[in-house]
């Protein structure tokens, strides 16, 4: 595993207007790959969307509950309304809050759904579960749920136990380092224009690079997919990023327009 750390800046801070979604009465906020955006919902809640994300919600937003559906990654700073819970629906879980700040990551191509709580409290439950079965998170906790386990009862996994079928079908609650500033934390690095990766194999990292730089990455052979990287990028162009990766671990690549072909150096 190789560590790469590069300083700089890369961010689009656009106020993204909502557009009409395919479903009648529903609106959508969308970010393309290579950009991030901030939006203000009708209730005063602020949402930051990471690259390649979509947020759907009812256009009146005046019901008994405030419900949104997320595909991708977003940070929510929810305005407290005691009698109107704010609910985020993802592909695997629902997150129910009153007023709080938290991050949710649920890209369709990712293996896990993750939510990290920074302020307040949240309840996490499967779509069909009642509130009585919800998992409570407190600040500085992160819940990680494999998507393959989304239809199974939520049960806490012990990270120190050997891998097993039962554990793989469970969620994990991890504690994040509360001594670090929010700008220094792994889970919210993207809010501060920093792409961080920890122990990612090249195939996993490629998905993040595709979203960050708006490129398409192809692997010419399977061998190179297993290379592991650890580090961060900010201001670097995609060309510079690949040069740093190549300097850490030898491999070949070719960039043509927005397409990148990667192959083994051996």
Task: Give the ranges of each region predicted by the language model.
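Core hydrophobic alpha-helical transmembrane segments of single-pass membrane proteins
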Residues: 1-5
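A residue-level detector for the "anchor" residue at the start of short, highly conserved motifs
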Residues: 6-266
């Amino acid at each position: 595993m190789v560590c790469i750390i590069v300083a700089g800046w890369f961010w689009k801070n656009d106020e993204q207007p909502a557009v009409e979604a395919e479903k009648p009465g529903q609106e959508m906020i969308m970010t393309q790959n290579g950009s991030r955006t901030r939006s203000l919902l009708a209730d005063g809640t602020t949402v930051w969307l990471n690259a390649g994300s979509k947020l759907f919600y009812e256009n009146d937003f005046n019901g008994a509950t405030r419900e949104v559906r997320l595909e991708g990654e977003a940070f929510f700073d929810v305005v407290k309304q005691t009698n109107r819970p704010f609910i985020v629906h993802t592909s695997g879980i629902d997150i129910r809050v009153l007023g709080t700040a938290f991050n949710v990551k649920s890209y369709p191509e990712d293996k896990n759904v993750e939510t990290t709580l920074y302020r307040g409290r949240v309840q996490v439950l499967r779509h069909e579960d009642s509130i009585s079965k919800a998992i409570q998170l407190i600040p500085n906790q992160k819940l990680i749920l494999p998507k393959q386990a989304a239809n199974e009862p939520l049960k806490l996994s012990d990270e120190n136990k050997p891998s097993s079928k039962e554990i793989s079908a469970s969620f994990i609650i991890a504690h994040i380092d509360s001594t670090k500033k929010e700008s220094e934390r792994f889970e919210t690095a993207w809010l501060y224009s920093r792409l961080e990766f920890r122990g990612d194999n090249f195939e996993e990292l490629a998905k993040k690079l595709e979203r960050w730089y708006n490129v398409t990455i192809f692997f010419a052979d399977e061998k190179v997919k297993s290379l592991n990287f650890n580090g961060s990028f900010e201001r670097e162009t995609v060309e510079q990023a690949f040069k740093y990766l190549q300097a850490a671990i030898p491999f070949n690549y070719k960039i043509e327009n927005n397409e990148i072909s990667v192959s083994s150096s051996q």
